[in-house]
Amino acid sequence: GPTLIVSGDDLRKIFKFNKYTATERKVLGKYYCDYAKFITNQKINLIFAVVAMRDSTRHWNKKNIDNYLEIYIKTNIKTIIKANKKKIYHKKNSGDIVGINIKPELPKKSDITINNNFKKSTDILSKELIRKIRTII
């Protein structure tokens, strides 16, 4: 069926959510859940890339979104800092960063886990992910 690909960063830009505190992230997480349910209720597949969801958010999604599939892209925070693709880890006074001064709630029971050490291309990781998805659905 039709599929929509959304990034949490994209929604932040569209709706001008520019606060990153733990409290604001919790509120935004609930908005993301409601948005995901709205889209999937219309029989649209949704691939939603977000960072650092909470255990309560994941639980809500599993309970309330039909055919919910959680994919965890696992990597070490030191590897992320070294890659620094978004240029957020070297900003002066960069507060409210998950993994730095906000403790992440890492998934405990993801349907799929992909280990990313930044040594494989995104093309290779994508193929690995598709292969794993096909074994589930």
Q: Residue ranges of each PLM-predicted region?
A:
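Conserved substrate/cofactor phosphate-moiety recognition/catalytic segment
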Residues: 1-37
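Short, solvent-exposed coil/turn elements at secondary-structure transition points
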Residues: 9-11, 76, 119
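Conserved beta-strand scaffold positions in the cores of enzyme catalytic domains, especially
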Residues: 3-5, 68-72, 111-113
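Arginine residue identity/basic-tract feature
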Residues: 12, 25, 54, 58, ...
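Amphipathic alpha-helical transducer elements in NTP-driven molecular machines
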Residues: 22-33, 55, 74-78, 107, ...
